[in-house]
Curated annotation (Swiss-Prot):
Subunit structure: The Tat system comprises two distinct complexes: a TatABC complex, containing multiple copies of TatA, TatB and TatC subunits, and a separate TatA complex, containing only TatA subunits. Substrates initially bind to the TatABC complex, which probably triggers association of the separate TatA complex to form the active translocon.
Record-linked Pfam families: TatA_B_E
Principal cellular location given in the protein's record: membrane
GO process annotations (BP): protein transport by the Tat complex
A cellular component annotation (GO) from this entry: TAT protein transport complex
Family label: Belongs to the TatA/E family.
The keyword Transmembrane belongs to this UniProt entry's keyword annotation: yes
Organism: Mycolicibacterium vanbaalenii (strain DSM 7251 / JCM 13017 / BCRC 16820 / KCTC 9966 / NRRL B-24157 / PYR-1)
UniProt-recorded name of the protein: Sec-independent protein translocase protein TatA
InterPro entries according to UniProt: TatA/B/E, TatA/E
Amino acid sequence: MGGLQPWHWVIVIAVFVLLFGAKKLPDAARSLGKSMRIFKSEIKEMQADSQSAKPDQPAAPTQIASERVPEAEPSSPDKRPA
């Protein structure tokens, strides 16, 4: 019941034919395939770039010197009426 039955696919295809027309469907499928190929090639290129950009060994942690800061005193008491 949760999956698509064959008659669901028939309805979907009929809607596409009605919306786009029989002449435009091959062009739409061709452009969709071309877009998917471009998308996949970009994903592969990004993965290759990220793998080549990773250093082999992580950098050694650096020591950070800290200084003690004196505590601040209140500048002036509130002079609002109570």
